[in-house]
């Protein structure tokens, strides 16, 4: 029995040592500013070996010693220190997905109402206290502070650096560990219904991006958000703050005002688009009448281009079914002008040109453009174009040809009336003709000299033609004098 008692005592000592090691590991993992040595008193249990006791009494004695040993372990200073840490810091045990099931205890530093994050500690020479360094957890806040704690965990000295550029957080806010941004944090609230802030922000962003996500219910002016599922975000933040429905409405209205009046459309207006059952988009009659401003002009001309006062640029042409004439497409050459036109000739009347205008000009007619009337005859247009294209040489040649026609006409008159006139009247008429011819030739020479050009060959030809015409007239004047003598 003595040997059995020694074996049981040794087993109990091994179990007790394992339990104390586990407690030491838990204390080592805490985020405390200082490490306090823990003295663990181990009570040695002595099992009296009684040769006279029975096995049943020994079995009763062994559980009693084990229970007493566990009570001693629980009542040790280590177990008293653990609840003290939880009371002073009020930490939240958050389970990290990256570190498995190892507990992470965060120290609560909320005495001044702000959230702080510890980023270092050190032992100062000549100071018995451990100095800890903290910075504010608010983004871009430069406030810092230093704490000095005693061995018992009491704050001895606090020094602040910088000022906070933000208001104090709410009393129920949860301090988030910035080093564990990828972890999933949940707020512990008293019976409040938690909502996903990521989904709320997603909905508000969708409303500001496209107002189509806001729909009006029939018979009321209450605006409701379309139920859209936000993308699943790993590690989304859940908070216990639930905004009322009125706040959501004001956020929607403000976001629509920020985007401007152009993006905010009234989808109940008559000019809005309406969707058919088949899915095709149909424009309302109001919008169709405003956009379809067409003007059709009929012009009787043989030319395919009509001058309407504006400048056009051709950008296409195609054949029309049932018509042998193609259709040409033009757009106004003025920058930014939306006017277009297409021109085609009528298949029933070849002289009829049909011009269809689309849109309105947003500018004045360019200067130097003359509008031709639709009822103007093509012959008149041709005459004007011919007069504009005349040159000095062509005008002189035309005057010479006119003179030749006049001379031929006078010759015919003299031949027909020569027998009725007397012999004395013949020479008088011939002299008058000569004088008229000379005057016209002199006038033509003066005109040609005034409008002379480097090309001298044409002037020489005109003079040669004039000399020949004068020679022929003189030879013809001599013939009538001999004819009466022979008769």
Curated annotation (Swiss-Prot):
Induction: By salicylic acid (SA). Zn(2+) binds at residues 136, 141, 164, 166, 332, 337, 361, 363. Changing residue 313 to E: Reduced DNA-binding activity. Coiled coil: none annotated. It is found in: Nucleus. Changing residue 327 to A/E: Impaired DNA-binding activity. The modification Phosphoserine is found at residue 76. A motif (Nuclear localization signal) lies at residues 273-277. Expressed to similar levels in root and flower, to a somewhat lower level in stem and to low levels in leaf and siliques. InterPro entries: WRKY_dom (IPR003657), WRKY_dom_sf (IPR036576), WRKY_plant (IPR044810). Residues 69-104, 255-287, 380-487 are annotated as: Disordered. The keyword DNA repair does not apply. Pfam families: WRKY (PF03106). One of its GO terms (cellular component) is mitochondrion. Keywords: Activator, DNA-binding, Metal-binding, Nucleus, Phosphoprotein, Repeat, Transcription, Transcription regulation, Zinc. Changing residue 314 to R: Reduced DNA-binding activity. Binding to target DNA is mediated mainly by the C-terminal WRKY domain, while part of the activation domain is located between positions 210 and 285. This is WRKY transcription factor 1. It comes from Arabidopsis thaliana (Mouse-ear cress). The lineage of its organism: Eukaryota, Viridiplantae, Streptophyta, Embryophyta, Tracheophyta.
